[in-house]
Amino acid sequence: MGSRRPRLPGFGEDCEPRGGGRGGGGRGRGSYYPQAQQYHPQGHGGRGGAGYYHGAAPQPRGAMVVQQWRPATAAAEHLGHQQPYNSSVRPQHYYGPSAIAPELLQAMDAPHEPPANVSSPEAASPEASSPRSLALEVTEQLQDLSVQYQLSESQEEIVQHVPVSTKSFKFPHRPGSGSIGTRCLVKANHFFAQLPDKDLHQYDVSITPELTSRIRSRAVMEELVRLHKMSYLGGRLPAYDGRKSLYTAGPLPFTSKEFRISLLEEDDGSGSERRQKTYNVVIKFAARADLHRLEQFLAGRQAEAPQEALQVLDIVLRELPTARYAPFGRSFFSPDLGRRRSLGEGLETWRGFYQSIRPTQMGLSLNIDMSATAFFEPLPVIDFVIQLLNTDIRSRPLSDAERVKIKKALRGVKVGVTHRGNMRRKYRISGLTSQATRELTFPVDQGGTVKSVVQYFQETYGFAIQHTYLPCLQVGNQQRPNYLPMEVCKIVEGQRYSKRLNQNQIRALLEETCQRPHDRERDIIQMVNHNSYHEDPYAKEFGIKISERLALVEARILPAPRLKYNETGREKDCLPRVGQWNMMNKKMVNGGRVRSWICVNFARNVQESVASGFCRELARMCQASGMDFALEPVLPSMYARPDQVERALKARFHDAMNILGPQHKELDLLIGLLPDNNGSLYGDLKRICEIDLGLVSQCCCTKQVFKMNKQILANLALKINVKVGGRNTVLVDAVSRRIPLVTDRPTIIFGADVTHPHPGEDSSPSIAAVVASQDWPEVTKYAGLVSAQSHRQELIDDLYNITHDPHRGPICGGMVRELLISFKRSTGQKPQRIIFYRDGVSEGQFYQVLLHELDAIRKACASLEANYQPQVTFIVVQKRHHTRLFAHNHNDQNSVDRSGNILPGTVVDSKICHPTEFDFFLCSHAGIKGTSRPAHYHVLWDENNFTADALQTLTNNLCYTYARCTRSVSIVPPAYYAHLAAFRARFYMESDSSDSGSMASGRGGGSSTSRSTRAAGGGAVRPLPALKDSVKNVMFYC
């Protein structure tokens, strides 16, 4: 978004690989050769001198071990002759997608002063710690990521390439446990699981005819076990995954056997008669699950988790709840597990629990948490429609809009009929008739005789249809549709609602699941007791024993950092208490400037005098907080209708510019007053301001205007300040250069996230966002970029890319590259360290994301300058997990905050964490409502060799620098900002589809450039519209 920057292949002022500067006598930066990654300096010293990245890298902990490349014959024929890794070659030119993929090189040491001689990095010896299939997959994916660099705009392109290699993945080992902070004990919702002492056997299952439904497959297997458990199965009680695998505790009496099982046909929802159907089931021995490897892994003597053994144990413990409850993902729901609550529009909540077996330092643990989700209420269809439309439709026909809404809501839903006595046939709704019931007829014989639906129901069932002006439900297939009047149908119980909830439903669901810590802990314990794992026949069969006590875990409470404010304030710094502080007697460390501003009021119930008074008080608060803020607007406040938002904003903007233009001034800020329920207005306003007008804006809801206390005004001032380029606070330790591995040499901190469309929006792209710090050593101000990419794709495509200009040839680009250049422009320094916080990655995607995104970071760095390889630490941030931490004693006021949650700064890096890898749970925020969810940080790559204390303290301290409030936040700010940026970008593409401004309010986007990617099927993803240059480099997304 925003016009693309001119091509800047290097950190220098122009595109030539030259340097200058005063020292060293050489002319320019030196020669860049793609030979063994060596840099041959022609001179150094001075500000334009040679690169200062040299020497063999310190071996990153764990790490991806690089082998010297040895091409196979076929590969050599395809790729051409390659030189050994450390030999010299002449410069070569590679262009286009057939170029050779670069290595994921380990970073080289990067001292401030350039050396006289630079040596090439040495390849480390290979290790073989991953399964062969993973290594092959990694290599294949790396080869698919082939790309080349353009380092210069000159006629002779200097292109660096690094050869492909095989590699063995090994995430960093834990560098010991942390020691900083006050030690304490907390309880975690993990329950120790004792490993079985039995041999686990796996059998392949083949069912003919083939079944796609897990429910039907389980029904077949349940019947087989019922008939043959004590005979052919040798008394074994097997666990079945619902697809192709069966597991037993010990061998079956055969290696392969075929069974014939007869069941009533599955109810397909068409209403046809169900008949007996016979299935052939073949059970064949496949393998033994190796529990010894699992024991070795849990003891820390093996790096690779034996997923097969963990999967078997997980399936065993899921077998009974799957039979009892409605399973969805790793959760189970039932109306018997807690009270139901209506969500409105025909939906209700079902309570349930989440269950997952996990390898941890204390051994195997079963993670149990409370859960809730939305189900259809088992209502008569007419009652459902009345709730859906929020109006009684029993006395009038439906409008076309109402018909469309009903059809969309009911398509695919199962209903039972009520007009046939005890015969409750079930049908699946495929549509809605366009005609009213009284107008519907159907043929009854081949002679062309027709009968009305009303007449048929009267004659056949003795049922008089009352609401004949309503349409019928259409059930069955399109070739032979059946018509059912709404009044004879009732929604079948137990159908989960998988579409997008509206804001009121989301709010009601959150209220239902929001529990104080003590209550949630009690419910979890009760759920474990209710599940009676000690009586579970499958757990007993396999010898698995589950503790009924929450894990007691050692934790530490990290101290809050001291925050720096402006010297002109009465308080020049402060120490937060329990994760909170305020702006009283303080001034922003760098106040922004707002010399010209306007206000547009879209809230009908806010009078002009009230709007003007609110803006005046807000301007005074901004001034008092340290901003250079004009007290009077350029033009008086103006009311505009929400449906005229574009016309009103553009007209008012041009009126203001007619005044400011002759004075050579720009409009700095728009204040928008919005109704509390503003629909798509918020997103429309942001899109128009940032895309069309190049103007930052601050939206305020009606309730804020009427409440207008100092806290509200102070929070708005914080947001406005960073939107116009100011900084609210910085860490005292950053200013005094006391943050290990951050302030000792130029460091850039990235945050990245991908947001996906809501369920049902199959054509919408996913939005990737990357932000990066633009100040050093303070690391407080962030710029951001966003990119549209293929639907529901988690890997970020546009971290590094090459576009092909017909006149200039290949041009390097990408979000990481542009943010590195922006950092150099802002600070005058080249980053020598990269700390990359990646949000939203599940454990199953760790390898894939690291492979793709670390590779892109490496390419982006190498495209800027030969041998430019800053040391990278790559950390995944996870919030969508189910680990909860509780105070050991809820009545101890010194160990809980006001909400009853554990204190901010509580960190856990033992017992419930990974057996060997570098991860930790950090609760960095004070609870407000409900039970706090700690963030989980997992280090996937670490060339900076962080200690546990250094990374935990850095992460916790950064959580106090979030720009929008005077509270520490729950995840590290760069990841938070990336999340906001991705959501803001969706407004630019979906300005008409937002259901509610309340969801949108406060979510923003990053400084960004218009980007386009290709979908997996080859279709172009619609590019994001361009952001104006005047808002690109400020934190307007706050």
UniProtKB/Swiss-Prot annotation:
Q: Does the keyword Zinc-finger apply?
A: no
Coiled-coil stretches noted in the UniProt entry, renumbered to this chain: none
The PAZ domain is annotated at 380-493
Which GO MF terms does the UniProt record name?
RNA binding; RNA endonuclease activity
Question: What are the Low complexity biased-composition ranges?
Answer: 115-134
* SMART domains the record matches: DUF1785, PAZ, Piwi
Source organism superkingdom: Eukaryota
* Functional note: Probably involved in the RNA silencing pathway. May bind to short RNAs such as microRNAs (miRNAs) or short interfering RNAs (siRNAs), and represses the translation of mRNAs which are complementary to them.
Q: What is this protein called?
A: Protein argonaute 1D
Organism source for this protein? Oryza sativa subsp. japonica
